[in-house]
Amino acid sequence: MTIKYAAKEDISAIAAVEAECFPPAEAAIEAEFVERVKYYGNHFWLLYNADKLIAFVDGFVTDELDLTDEMYENAAMHNENGAWQMIFGVNTLPDYRKHGYAGELISRAIADAKQQGRKGLVLTCKERLIPYYAKFGFKDEGVSDKSTHGNVAWHQMRLSF
């Protein structure tokens, strides 16, 4: 298993994993990943098993305190010197779930954010996933009023350093 950052040649695989992990209303499409990788490929954590992408975590950096729907749509909002590492997606192919791979990538994103001097990380998740992210130190801030992505109630969670 190898963890790496995203480059142009990873985009098709990233989009395929995303499509398998999220319903269409929530999944980013390949064109969105082209923009995301262009602006913040170094904030994608990709886990490869040989030459197969099996899991990834991604999100950009900003000074904004809260994750908003606009962030998903506008990769140019990325600010490499921002205070907060946002997490937009945590994806693992179904056949590879329950092996700790997503946790390994989340831990790597946390370590990188600390090393880069960020204030912490912010993500949104469905209610059933709150206990999962709490294991990494994220605190539930309640249902977000700034994200209704895919017409879902998202809980904002924050890990502050």
Question: Language-model segments: which ranges?
Answer:
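A short beta-loop-alpha structural element at the N-terminal edge
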Residues: 2-14
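Hydrophobic adenine-recognition pocket in adenosine-nucleotide-binding enzymes
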Residues: 6, 90-92
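Conserved acetyl-CoA-binding loop of GNAT-fold acetyltransferases
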Residues: 23, 134-143
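Active-site rim helix/loop that mediates acceptor-substrate recognition in acyltransferases
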Residues: 24-50, 56-77
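Short hydrophobic/aromatic beta-strand element in the GNAT-like acyltransferase core
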Residues: 42-46, 56, 89, 122, ...
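Conserved acyl-donor/pantetheine-binding loop and adjacent beta-alpha core of acyl/acetyltransferases
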Residues: 55-90, 97, 107, 147-154
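Conserved GNAT acetyl-CoA-binding A-motif
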Residues: 106, 112-125
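C-terminal "cap" of GNAT-fold acetyltransferases
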Residues: 126-127, 146-161
